[in-house]
Amino acid sequence: MQVSVETTQGLGRRVTITIAADSIETAVKSELVNVAKKVRIDGFRKGKVPMNIVAQRYGASVRQDVLGDLMSRNFIDAIIKEKINPAGAPTYVPGEYKLGEDFTYSVEFEVYPEVELQGLEAIEVEKPIVEVTDADVDGMLDTLRKQQATWKEKDGAVEAEDRVTIDFTGSVDGEEFEGGKASDFVLAMGQGRMIPGFEDGIKGHKAGEEFTIDVTFPEEYHAENLKGKAAKFAINLKKVEERELPELTAEFIKRFGVEDGSVEGLRAEVRKNMERELKSAIRNRVKSQAIEGLVKANDIDVPAALIDSEIDVLRRQAAQRFGGNEKQALELPRELFEEQAKRRVVVGLLLGEVIRTNELKADEERVKGLIEEMASAYEDPKEVIEFYSKNKELMDNMRNVALEEQAAEAVLAKAKVTEKETTFNELMNQQA
């Protein structure tokens, strides 16, 4: 076997391999012997068919199969010998084959980039310092009450957290536009669902009033024909409602799994959940900064084959989220996923190098802790932990999470880490 390797472009490689004619003939004869032992031909007993008849009937197909097998095996031998690490599936380009002559073919593929990590000492990471305060717990209790609130119609003017039922008709330069009209539209104030100025124009009005508000569509608005345009909305305010928050009764509290129904028990449970969320948020915030710094400090080439593979993964995930099938997934435009796919590949390659250079392996105690932390959010944590322990795929996924965290910590060990005090709400809003 003769082998030559050349660089085509960037990470592209072409391996050219020549297989000696006698090697091909030896392999063909060997395979024909195997075929002769199995075939049945009228007039002959099984295994007793003369080789010339076997060769006449099966020679062409056997030779084709043998060539394919030799191409594959010789390519594998070549990349092992040349210490080449292909990324993605190779493309075989067969040359012209002539009976009794050496056979030359080429294989084109991409290789993984050679990554030499640099700039880790210059990475800057800001670690949030946060405590869950009594005021934070009070705020979460208010949120829980709002989620369980009922609505009561009122006669007064619209206020910041009321709910309104309206008819509206929008126009630009006196012309109504598509999507600018609705009847019996229910709008909860303060949630930012409408364009700036819309809710402000409704506040202070009462049910039964009809009025017009002036707004301007944002420059980044999704509809091209409305970007930056001044508009008028004719409003018919049909109903105003205010929230009625439930009292913290034993019955209400027990809905959240606090068996004794006490306010103290609910506060303790809420605080525990908030502290679990906080721990995860801090960890994710620090890890994301470390990874972002790693990416900025290391500009690497990325094999197109890996990006294509990641795009397919993202397509399928998107299709599953929206109830699509495999065919619909592959029809989604690759442009929607290209940037995200490239970043995921870059991060994977860089973290892989961190793991390799630091000889990291998933810490089983960390894996156990991650599973327990995740399971604590469920009604029966023991059941969730047991389910994970019996599912190899889930356990492997959690080991990958642990290994990624360990890699991020290895980056952090060399980075410039500063601490910054912040609040629970500020941190959680950054995560959103």
UniProtKB/Swiss-Prot annotation:
Its main location: cytoplasm. SUPFAM superfamilies: FKBP-like (SSF54534), Triger factor/SurA peptide-binding domain-like (SSF109998), Trigger factor ribosome-binding domain (SSF102735). It is found in: Cytoplasm. GO terms for molecular function: peptidyl-prolyl cis-trans isomerase activity; protein folding chaperone; ribosome binding. Gene3D superfamilies: 3.10.50.40, Trigger factor ribosome-binding domain, Trigger factor, C-terminal domain. It is an enzyme of class 5 (isomerase). Residues 161-246 form the PPIase FKBP-type domain. One of its GO terms (biological process) is protein transport. Its EC number is 5.2.1.8. One of its GO terms (cellular component) is cytoplasm. It catalyses: [protein]-peptidylproline (omega=180) = [protein]-peptidylproline (omega=0). PROSITE patterns: FKBP_PPIASE. Pfam families: FKBP_C, Trigger_C, Trigger_N. The keyword Cytoplasm applies. The keyword Transferase does not apply. Keywords: Cell cycle, Cell division, Chaperone, Cytoplasm, Isomerase, Rotamase. Belongs to the FKBP-type PPIase family. Tig subfamily. Involved in protein export. Acts as a chaperone by maintaining the newly synthesized protein in an open conformation. Functions as a peptidyl-prolyl cis-trans isomerase. Homodimer and monomer. In vivo most of the ribosomes are in complex with monomeric TF. Uncomplexed TF, however, is in a monomer-dimer equilibrium with approximately two thirds of TF existing in a dimeric state. Consists of 3 domains; the N-terminus binds the ribosome, the middle domain has PPIase activity, while the C-terminus has intrinsic chaperone activity on its own. This is Trigger factor. It comes from Shigella dysenteriae serotype 1 (strain Sd197).
